[in-house]
Amino acid sequence: MYAIVEIAGKQFKVTKDLYIYTPKMDQEAGSSVSFDKILLLQNDQDIQVGDPTVAGAKIEGKVIEHVKGDKIIVFKRKRRKGYKTKQGHRQGYTKVLIQNILR
């Protein structure tokens, strides 16, 4: 059984007991979280496609930890002018364990 779920504008294919990295959420580590924007739900041979979401479907998960992604360097330079700037950025992510997919 798997589902396609939309979390913070991004789509994830999830199954039970799967760890996913979502954009940073406000919940504390250890708290439970549920998602109700299920776009597609597959159970054995039955596939339900939402219009736009599957009614009554819900995914339960648990927030494991908050982490940062790899550092991205933004470097700007203008030739012959002596202008250069260097800026770094690390995006925040939340690690979520998918515990259950409910219809």
Swiss-Prot record:
Gene Ontology biological process terms, A to Z: translation
Q: Which UniProt keywords apply?
A: Ribonucleoprotein, Ribosomal protein, RNA-binding, rRNA-binding
The UniProt entry, under InterPro entries, shows: bL21-like, bL21-like_sf, Ribosomal_bL21, Ribosomal_bL21_CS
Q: What Gene Ontology molecular function terms does this protein carry?
A: rRNA binding; structural constituent of ribosome
Pfam families (alphabetical) = Ribosomal_L21p (PF00829)
User: Which terms in the GO cellular component ontology are assigned?
Assistant: cytoplasm; ribonucleoprotein complex; ribosome
Concerning PROSITE patterns, the annotation shows: RIBOSOMAL_L21
The record's function comment reads: This protein binds to 23S rRNA in the presence of protein L20.
Q: Which NCBIfam families match?
A: L21
The family line of this record is: Belongs to the bacterial ribosomal protein bL21 family.
Binding partners and assembly: Part of the 50S ribosomal subunit. Contacts protein L20.
What this protein is called in its record is Large ribosomal subunit protein bL21
Q: What is the lineage of its organism?
A: Bacteria, Pseudomonadati, Bacteroidota, Cytophagia, Cytophagales
